[in-house]
Regions:
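Sequence-structural signature of mature extracellular/luminal beta-sheet repeat domains
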Residues: 1-5, 12-17, 44-53
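Beta-propeller domains
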Residues: 41-44, 49, 56-63, 83, ...
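Loop/turn residues immediately N-terminal
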Residues: 11-15, 58-62, 107-111, 151-155, ...
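Short loop/turn segments that connect beta-strands within beta-propeller blades
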Residues: 19-23, 66-70, 115-119, 158-162, ...
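Residue-level detector of Asp-centered blade-edge/turn motifs that repeat once per structural unit
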Residues: 1-2, 47-51, 96-99, 140-144, ...
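Fold-core signature of tandem repeat domains
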Residues: 25, 72, 102, 121-124, ...
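Residue-level "micro-hotspots" composed of small/polar
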Residues: 35-42, 79-92, 122, 126-139, ...
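Conserved beta-propeller blade signature
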Residues: 4-8, 52-56, 101-105, 145-148, ...
Length: 282
């Protein structure tokens, strides 16, 4: 801000201000109200938005410092008002998008989107489709979608539809675990992501989702009444007909089914319902 660089050195170290014009480094600066508190926090990430410096800490939540009035405001997961909750006090990464929205990545709580007008947060976590609540980095592509690296794969978040699309080692994402802040977008919209086994690169515009829904067929059936009558193990019977007639006492049976596609078959999810017995799809 104004040719001033803010530097966070980590554990037990102060936040520094470096002035480009006179080549001076400051270890202290005016703070109203919480100066002692600011001197002991472990800052993980810094972001500047307008007159504010945002500081994400490892265990003390989020701080906002006004560079003109020198006021310091704290946001934490223990705030009394629910809408002021951070998803976690362990802030791992901060990101500002093209509209200067502040996105807060945490370890254990997912993502928080800060509303500057209401001074509140919208939380996105595993319940909303995020693959994991431990966030290592957040970076937007040229279309405004956020690419979020977690401890269990990469996720693409569409802010307009508020939906997640996830990638892991089951559908082509080869990193076992990403590293903190190890995500970079180049000027040509190429992403580079670093992990504990290697790093990878990809172009979001070239990724195509597999939207094909394969047909599902019942392939085998085992009727337990046969086991009770014949005093022998019930055998699996291959199913080739569209309709099967059962006797009145053949009320207990097991079926096997399959989706006829080998494209990332482990990602297929199934729902089932027995008409006349179940009230809805499971």
């Amino acid at each position: 801000t104004d040719n001033i660089y803010w530097i966070a050195l980590g554990v037990d170290s102060p936040i520094l201000r470096y002035h480009m014009e006179n080549n001076q480094l400051e270890e202290s600066f005016p703070v109203k109200g919480r100066a002692t508190e600011l001197s002991i926090i472990n800052v993980q990430d810094l972001k500047a938005i307008g007159p504010y410096i945002w500081m994400g800490t490892r265990a003390a939540g989020l701080y906002r410092y006004h560079t003109q009035t020198h006021e310091l405001k704290h946001f934490g997961s223990e705030e009394k008002s629910p809408e002021q909750f951070l998803p976690s006090n362990h802030v791992s990464t901060l990101y500002t998008d093209a509209s200067e929205n502040l996105w807060i990545g945490t370890y254990g709580g997912g993502i928080g989107l800060y509303n500057n007008i209401k001074e509140s947060f919208t939380i996105y976590n595993e319940e909303n489709g995020l693959p994991n609540n431990a966030i290592n980095s957040i970076v937007a592509d040229n279309n405004g979608k956020l690419w979020v690296s977690t401890l269990k794969g990469m996720s693409c978040f569409d802010p307009k539809s508020e939906t997640f699309t996830n990638w892991d080692n089951k559908n082509g994402y080869s990193l076992l675990e990403t590293n903190l802040h190890a995500c970079l977008k180049s000027s040509s919209n190429i992403f580079y992501v670093g992990g504990n086994n290697h790093f990878l690169s990809f172009n979001p515009q070239l990724i195509r989702r597999n939207t094909f829904i394969p047909p599902v067929y019942i392939t085998k059936m085992r009727i337990w009444a046969d086991y009770l009558e014949d005093n022998k193990a019930a055998q699996w019977v291959n199913i080739s007909n569209q309709r099967i007639k059962l006797r009145y006492n053949q009320t207990s049976f097991t079926i096997k089914f399959s989706a006829l596609s080998y494209v990332f078959a482990s990602n297929n999810k199934f729902s089932y319902m027995l008409e006349g017995f179940d009230k809805g799809w499971s």
